[in-house]
Every structure is written in C-alpha cells, then in structure tokens.
C-alpha cells in the first residue's frame, strides 16, 4: 500500500488507554513520503467530528464539512499524534492538498510540540 503525506485514511485506533482517541476514525498522515515508502509504520493525527459549540484550541485545526472526503465538520487533533502500522489503515477519504490548510496543521503541530517555526 502506497501511503502519502497529507492523505486522510480510516484507521482502527483501538486498543487505547484513558483519553487517547480510539475506535475506527479518519486520521491524517503526517510522516514524510520518503519514510512512508520504506517503513511499515506511519505518523498520523486522529480526526474527530466537531460537535456544535465545541471550541477549537491552538493545537487543533478545523476542517469544514464535505472537504477532503469527510462528510462532517471535523477537527484535526494535533495533541493526539500517533504512530501506526500501515495495516491499521483502510479506506482513503482524500488528500489535504490546499497549502493554506497544510500550513495551519503544521502551525498547530509546532504549537503542540513547542517548536518555534513559521510555516
């Protein structure tokens, strides 16, 4: 399976402990293509549906409904970075190809990790 950075897949995240995101849900691949091509693991960020009135934090990025193959308004949870075996990935929803949205995600990741970086 060829996995590309910025692609959104469905992934099985269970088993989990405590507040970790679980179940089968969309995830955003953030690891570099050169690494994805040679390793059996990928770095991902879980995505969750946005509930009405839910606040968006600086380490999160909103994705409007009906974008990138997702039917609901969603949130990329940069505080929940995970490493997964590629076999956990199934359905490809789409790809975040908009540079502005990629930059928002990089900025949220840097905020989460305490990295001073201008995307």
Model-found features: residue ranges?
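C-terminal terminal-subdomain/extension
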Residues: 1, 66-119
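Short secondary-structure boundary segments
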Residues: 1-2, 20
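Low-complexity, compositionally biased segments
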Residues: 17, 36, 40-43, 88, ...
């Amino acid at each position: 399976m060829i996995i590309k950075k910025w692609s959104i897949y469905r992934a099985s995240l269970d088993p989990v402990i405590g507040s970790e995101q679980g179940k089968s849900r969309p995830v955003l691949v953030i690891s570099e293509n050169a690494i994805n091509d040679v390793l059996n693991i990928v770095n991902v960020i879980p995505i969750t549906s946005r509930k009405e009135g839910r606040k968006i934090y600086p380490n999160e990025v909103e994705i409007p409904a009906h974008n990138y193959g997702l039917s609901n308004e969603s949130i990329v949870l940069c505080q929940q970075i995970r490493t997964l075996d590629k076999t956990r990935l199934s359905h490809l929803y789409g790809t975040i190809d908009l540079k502005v949205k990629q930059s928002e995600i990089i900025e949220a990741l840097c905020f989460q990790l305490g990295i001073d970086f201008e995307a």
